[in-house]
């Protein structure tokens, strides 16, 4: 359906019999109303045309060929001057044949039937609402159990039958004949109730607000009683309280949605449009029918068998009527959910029939196969690999996938820049992979986000937006921090790529779905982008440094002997480096350059010149050593920093004791903070 905001959506729920008949009924020009399927037939074996009032009737579902009725007459579709719109002979409407994809019919059931989804699925909504055991309700639905109605000031059928059976044993065999007359239904319907009609009566009687109030009162009373001291009794009370909560929620749902509970019992059974349950011919002209058709035929056969004794004047034993009602209930159960009551129904080849539940549920069902997970244009799929050099909001897209997804945009760019005169020439340039194609592709990708999805999509973070960049190879490169949101691993997992086309979709992707804007879990609010174990190990190795303290060379005899054979190196006139002595650097660039030239190790301690910052200097710390120079300046050496002072004891500069790993880590954090400030300034 389409709401007032023009959003297409699908709503599933229970409907009234009036709504079902309104979907199917049509009034012919002669005043006849069609829409009810009364015959279990499909196509005539001689003419190969749909049977009238059958499962494929053209009067009910529309013509097989657009504008052509069952008689072969033709009318122009949509021409208001053409009159009439229905064929006077066969009653088929002159419309497009696509109407057979959505025009429904219905079967008028001779007796009410409980909907097995509401009755047998756990938790059973009918059992919860009526507060009765499921086994007792099953006996009632399948006519194994009956209950008496309260009748006042009337001779009861039950009392009369009991007196005949127990007081006058000689007339025991003649009494069933009396009760099999046509008046049996009148007596029985007044005195006793069984089958789905009994369930329907019980669902229609109670007030939902009273059910909610009584359940709340009982729940409070059980809560006030406290523990009984017996573990079994405590569990029993806990289960009862949980049941009362479910019952109140169910009643409130019916009140909120304005749905009558008796709709869980069917009086009219909808019939799917013919195109959704087709009959096709395979090789050799052999017809192959959908399993739904066979299950519909079974329902119609049993329903007609029950309708005949109820509408004709011939006598039928009451037990036979109840047995036939049970067969109708079982046939509808098989149609809706085959096998829910035990052994599923099979065909002649010992193959289980596919019911409604089998058609719509599961990975190959109607929803996941054709509505939610169907193949769409502007999408691709590939394996994901880690891209540690990527930003959090970027992903690497293989060239092969990128050129296919953005091909229409690239073609438009080639034509706009007069590189190609038409679409054919543009496609040839793309096929030949000319350099200008990749340049235009990069321009297109800069302003167009993409969506990455990993199945199953269990929560909002299963689909996130990224800014694509071209990557070599055939795998999608992904930042490791976004892995947790997708619940993915880099061990062969695959992801789907989608391109949002409309401006609304692109704006939603940029404002709501970008990965760097989804850092917290929507469920509990905890950070979702946290370092993994391998990242923590890498950071540990990067920042562990050399465990030797500043006094290691001074007080270690072995190091003191090696210190006598030191060698001094000059590098860019900015620092002095010795094999044993810790080197001095004026900037982090010099330190990283020495590391790249393999003059120092990643964990080698060094002295790095730093800006004067009082937060680095400890006010009461005593220097380990003071070194004086010839010009009067001196160095105060502390545990983690070195302070250079002038003759007047003024601080000239400061060196901090660090490693190349610490420098690299600090620079990455500093660049990230600066980029964040620029983005939000």
Swiss-Prot record:
Keyword flag Transcription regulation: no
SMART domains: RPOLA_N
Subcellular location: Plastid, Chloroplast
InterPro entries: DNA-dir_RpoC_beta_prime (IPR045867), RNA_pol_asu (IPR000722), RNA_pol_N (IPR006592), RNA_pol_Rpb1_1 (IPR007080), RNA_pol_Rpb1_3_sf (IPR042102), RNA_pol_Rpb1_clamp_domain (IPR044893), RNApol_RpoC1 (IPR034678)
Cofactor(s) essential for the protein: Mg(2+); Zn(2+)
Keyword Methyltransferase recorded: no
EC number: 2.7.7.6
Gene3D superfamilies: 1.10.40.90, 2.40.40.20, RNA polymerase II, clamp domain (4.10.860.120), RNA polymerase Rpb1, domain 3 (1.10.274.100)
Top-level taxon in the UniProt lineage: Eukaryota
Cofactor note: Binds 1 Mg(2+) ion per subunit. Binds 1 Zn(2+) ion per subunit.
Residues holding Mg(2+): 489, 491, 493
GO molecular function: DNA binding; DNA-directed RNA polymerase activity; magnesium ion binding; zinc ion binding
GO CC aspect terms: chloroplast; DNA-directed RNA polymerase complex; mitochondrion
Main location: plastid
Top-level class of the enzyme under EC nomenclature: transferase
Keywords: Chloroplast, DNA-directed RNA polymerase, Magnesium, Metal-binding, Nucleotidyltransferase, Plastid, Transcription, Transferase, Zinc
Signal peptide bounds: none
Binding site for Zn(2+): 69, 71, 87, 90
Function in brief: DNA-dependent RNA polymerase catalyzes the transcription of DNA into RNA using the four ribonucleoside triphosphates as substrates.
Family: Belongs to the RNA polymerase beta' chain family. RpoC1 subfamily.
Name used for this protein in its record: DNA-directed RNA polymerase subunit beta'
Organism of this sequence: Drimys granadensis
